[in-house]
Amino acid sequence: MRFQSKQYVRWGDLDAFGHVNNATYLVYAQEARYAWSKMIEMVVARAEVDFIAPIYVGDFNLDIEIWVNKIGTSSFGVTYEMKNGDELVAVVKTVQVTVSMDTKKSRPLNDAERDFLNKYLEN
């Protein structure tokens, strides 16, 4: 199963070339991830972006699909496909690490988190 999200492209997201700034793709991924999994206390340990096609200001609605690509003991991988209509414009991959908000240290995934993530797991 994949989580579906929409992201609005704002004027402030553009760079001097008139397309969405490269750093903004990670903001889009973050917004979609939060809507999908706000129940999990986590931090980003790694992020990578494959830029496939530029996004311009006229491309106001970006469709983002999210799924889990790996589940470990205290971390999991997430893939985000970003599309403008039918056109794939970027693929973002992150590694998330679950943390304790009290100790600020990594901790193992609990059963509820693991069950949630398994619903979105694609190998």
Question: What residue ranges belong to the model's regions?
Answer:
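Terminal targeting signals and extreme-terminal segments of soluble enzymes
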Residues: 1-61, 69-123
